[in-house]
Structure formats: C-alpha cells, structure tokens
C-alpha cells in the first residue's frame, strides 16, 4: 500500500507538471476565497475542530498535533469538508498543506479536486457513516453526513503544456534515469527509443 501511494504521488507530480495552469488557477481562486471566508463561522469552526461532527473534530486535532493523517482519513476529511460542511475545497487543501509534514502540492491539490469531483469530472468521493464506523471500530458516534451530494462542477479544461526533449545522442540501448518530479508518461518524450533499463528515482 505504501508503494502504491508513492506511485500515485509521483503520477500526480507528472500530471500537474503537464498542466501548470491548474496550480496557477488554484492560487488565484484561493486568494479570493481566503478573503471571502476569513470571518465565516462555519470555516472557523472547521479549522478549530468545533463542528457537530465528532470524528471530523478529532481529525482536526490529530492533524494539528501530529501533522499527519492516514490516507483513508484524508479522504473522509476532504469529503466531509466539501459536501457536509459545504466549504470550498481550496481552503481545505490549504489547511492540509499548513499542517501535513508530508504535504505535497501536486498530490494534495489534485487529491482534493478528485474528492470534489472536478479532477475526474462527475466522479466524486462521498464519505459515509457506515464506512467510517467500520474502519474505526465504531469509535465515533455523531456521524451525520451528506451522503447524497452531487459532485462539484467546473467548466474549466486544461490543455497539456509539453516541453520538447532535445538530445542529439542516440538513446537506443541506453539506460534511462527518471526522477520522481519529472515523471510525465502520459505523453512520453522517448516513445521512439528502446532502452536497456529504466530507473525511477
């Protein structure tokens, strides 16, 4: 599972690298939303762990104290934030980045977009009471969630911005070393080459 999550993180880095305007738009939207919600009671209660959802409050405090949440918990947290508390996903993504020791701009931003339903249009993630109780051994009781919320809608689309790779050398039968922050294989620069070995670092 750990290796799977590392690979997802690497994939998201490559995905965002090809679509830098997703990040640019997020920063622009966040700046405006942050100002709009600076005195919003629901938002302030959420970041202080003072909502009427027991498990969410516990996770807020856990995040602040330990600077970490389990991956499944992060999904529950984001879903509750977006669909039950009805707060902007941009603020939730910022809250995670402020506290997570392992926070990564690409996987965090795109993960929140995925939960909301705008990363894969029309497909969102909804946390449910039974799922939370099952995987927390019925630890929490007050779990009243919006389990029928529709996905968020975004009219924006992003084209791939690709930088050409120029190398005059013959790369066939050579070894290729790829670093995690440059793993963009949706459109590969090396599709015409046959490598002896490929190393991912």
What residues fall within each predicted segment?
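C-terminal catalytic domain of photolyase/cryptochrome flavoproteins
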Residues: 1-72, 79-201
